[in-house]
């Protein structure tokens, strides 16, 4: 399958969006959040819950078990009890145990630094072969653990990108990852990701976007129409 190439219009619009949001939010520096194995677990815990809840559940998990090896060896019921504060613990506990054991069986450890040496597409393919690891989870690991130019697309980014027409109306969230990555230079992917999240949370909300407060009014095709 041929690699997607964005139109010049979308590339230029993304440049203007990034420039405007950079003026508003300033430089957001990349710093590694967790190692890749921990990021994998954290991402599972973050599904369908708030950042506060997922952070609490992750801290509880690591404080209790100390290492990912111990989590992988633990009973599912024990994991479930420890992560209960994060929500959907009954679904997430077996998912965490299963994927950790799959990774350990394949690699022998939870050191995934070898992914940095792979082409980005191959690193994504390697990660998404594991149960429960989709494009978003793979992109989060590659972006937040290694600083690679992978674009995680959450609900905020997906919504804002649709309204800005950076992606087409029929593109789903999974496809949005491959469509949004190439519209900005690789070194700006993390910044662009963070800018769109902040804009989605602060201004371009789902139900009542504050277009009157938006600094993208001259750029956005949906300005005042949502």
Residue positions per predicted region:
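Catalytic cores of DNA base-excision repair glycosylases
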Residues: 2-226
